[in-house]
């Protein structure tokens, strides 16, 4: 495995270079702006390329040493892509709403996750002695908990790295990461504040094609990290008679 490749052409085709209208900009983004066209800021992709490459390396390195990456993107056009990318790279995600204290009050979140597991257990057991009305109430509770916490139910603790789409919308997540010393990789559009972002990636954070490209690259970098971690253990995973259980699945089985 190796870090995923990408080209300037791919970034252009995905519209990564299109910022917001010039009057909506954050002046702190000035170093990353190439210019403007028809009152739209154009992001300097000559800076995006090395900064994106650096972020991919950080993701791979984090996973290679056994770390966990949390994908965060709750805006409509990012929600599904965030979940799919995190799942296929065996990582974690928040794609519905960031609950205040999700990282800084992990104990309370853990209790809610335990409640989700318990409700799951009740609903999956036959003849549990609950009436139809009670089961309906439990199903609604499970749906609500799953929507909020489904992407982190197997995380087992705060993550080692966070990847964020839209730093304006996910301001609370960034504040919590900063308080806990969790490094942040984030897309910074022309209307964003790049301060407190450890690994900023200048680029459009609204276009679906751009979001898909970022998430695909981050997911592939995480998969590269998994391969490196397995390689470092000296095991030939493919030659094993029994495939290893992924940590997330192991946690679920033991819950």
Swiss-Prot record:
Segments traversing the membrane: none
Keyword Ribonucleoprotein carried by entry: yes
Annotated region described as Disordered, given as residue ranges: 232-255
Any one biological process term the GO annotation gives: translation
GO MF term (any one): structural constituent of ribosome
CDD domains the record matches: RPS2
NCBIfam families with a match to the protein in the record: rpsB_bact (TIGR01011)
Protein name according to UniProt: Small ribosomal subunit protein uS2
Organism of this sequence: Agrobacterium fabrum (strain C58 / ATCC 33970)
Gene of this entry: rpsB
């Amino acid at each position: 495995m190796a870090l995923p490749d990408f080209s300037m052409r791919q970034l252009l085709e995905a519209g990564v270079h299109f910022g917001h209208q010039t009057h909506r900009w954050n002046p702190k983004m000035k170093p990353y702006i190439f210019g403007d066209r028809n009152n739209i800021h154009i992001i300097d992709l000559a800076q995006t390329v090395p900064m994106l490459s650096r972020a991919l390396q950080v993701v791979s390195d984090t996973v290679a040493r056994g770390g966990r990456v949390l994908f965060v993107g709750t805006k409509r056009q990012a929600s599904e892509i965030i979940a799919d990318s995190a799942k296929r790279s065996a990582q974690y995600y928040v794609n519905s709403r960031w609950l205040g204290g999700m990282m800084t009050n992990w104990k309370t979140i853990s209790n809610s996750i335990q409640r989700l597991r318990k409700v799951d257990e009740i609903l999956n057991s036959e003849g549990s002695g609950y009436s139809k009305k009670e089961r309906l109430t439990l199903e609604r509770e499970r749906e609500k908990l799953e929507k909020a916490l489904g992407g982190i139910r197997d995380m087992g603790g705060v993550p080692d790295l966070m990847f964020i789409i839209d730093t304006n919308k996910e301001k609370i997540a960034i504040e919590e990461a900063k308080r806990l010393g969790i490094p942040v990789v984030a897309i910074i559009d022309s209307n964003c504040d790049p301060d407190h972002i450890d690994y900023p990636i200048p680029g459009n954070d609204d276009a679906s094609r751009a979001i898909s490209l970022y998430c695909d690259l981050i997911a592939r970098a995480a998969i590269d990290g998994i391969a490196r971690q397995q390689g470092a253990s000296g095991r030939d995973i493919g030659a094993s008679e029994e495939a290893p259980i992924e940590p997330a699945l192991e946690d679920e089985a033991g819950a």
